[in-house]
UniProtKB/Swiss-Prot annotation:
Family as reported in the entry's similarity comment: Belongs to the UbiA prenyltransferase family.
Lineage summary: Bacteria, Pseudomonadati, Pseudomonadota, Betaproteobacteria, Burkholderiales
One example GO MF annotation: 4-hydroxybenzoate polyprenyltransferase activity
Protein name as catalogued: 4-hydroxybenzoate octaprenyltransferase
Principal subcellular localisation of the protein: membrane
Protein's organism: Paraburkholderia phymatum (strain DSM 17167 / CIP 108236 / LMG 21445 / STM815)
């Protein structure tokens, strides 16, 4: 068992934390806004651990769903299931176990949060299969990656206000942006194996679509900033996030594989800048 631990860690991408961070930033945004900048330590721990666990479970299910495709993609041909080092049933069992632990984490929370967690599990578990028939599965991914937003509001306020759903919509557009960059890396392989991605759907308008998605995401947060009366520190963070998006354009405009992958990874800084602006605003209010 312990000898196989490195394989399981690879399966759930513990060596690639960028995915967990892309889930964590929007969740932290929601926790800070829902609590007026004063989230409890217990909620921070629950949501941080839950994010990592559910992202890991999602990776295991993704590799299970894509096991017959990954062998034809250069970037994924050596993944544990595809290479035969881990059996398919092991991935399913691991995903189920991680999901159970994540659910146990939220047992102390209110009923609404638990109900939303069921919907979150369904979306996360079905996302990998949408690549077979959805033209833009990245939008579905955005819902899965953003479900921590309504759950955070539910945990803090015992309700999910309109603001939470607006933030979820922003997350969908952000996810389409960064995961299209990711899909551009595998474009040629995805064409051969017949998987649908936003990079293929957008075609020659892929770069334009990505930048429009960034614009919508940031535009929504402009509206949130005005609505909530955020101060200058928030706007500095938002400006930094916008700067990241502009930098991504310089990386993806040539549609080369490695720069596109670098742009995807750099979204951690975009998300971090936005959260820093939100956290700084509330911190300044405390003085």
């Amino acid at each position: 068992m312990f000898a196989r631990l490195p394989l399981y860690l690879r399966l759930v991408r513990m060596d690639k934390p960028i995915g967990s961070l892309l889930l964590l930033w929007p969740t932290l945004n929601a926790l800070w806004i829902a609590s007026d900048g004063h989230p409890s330590v217990s909620l921070l721990v629950i949501f941080a651990l839950g994010t990592i666990l559910m992202r890991s479970a999602g990776c295991a299910i993704n590799d299970y769903a894509d096991r017959d495709f990954d062998r034809y993609v250069k970037r994924t041909e050596n993944r544990p299931i595809t290479s035969g080092k881990i059996k398919a049933w092991e991935a399913v069992a691991l995903a189920a176990g991680l999901s159970l632990v994540a659910f146990l984490l939220i047992l102390p929370l209110n009923a609404l949060t638990k109900e939303l967690s069921v919907a979150a599990l369904f979306v996360a578990g079905t996302y990998p299969f949408t690549k077979r028939f959805f033209a833009i599965p990245q939008a579905y991914l955005g819902i899965a990656f953003g479900f921590g937003i309504p759950m955070a509001f539910a945990a803090v306020q015992n309700q999910v206000p309109l603001l939470a759903w607006v933030m979820l919509i922003a997350n969908v557009f952000w996810s389409v942006a960064y995961d299209t960059e990711y899909a551009m890396v595998d474009r040629d392989d995805d064409i051969k194996i017949g998987i649908r991605t936003s990079a293929l759907t957008f075609g020659r308008f892929d770069v334009l679509a990505i930048m429009l998605c960034y614009a919508v995401t940031l535009g929504i947060y402009v509206g949130i900033g005005f609505t909530l009366g955020f101060g200058v520190l928030y706007w500095i963070g938002l400006a930094a996030a916008a700067g990241c998006a502009v930098y991504h354009y310089t990386l993806i405009k040539g549609r080369e594989r490695m720069p596109c992958f670098a742009a995807f990874r750099h979204n951690n800084w975009l998300g971090g800048a936005l959260f820093a602006g939100i956290a700084a605003h509330y911190a300044a209010q405390a003085f």
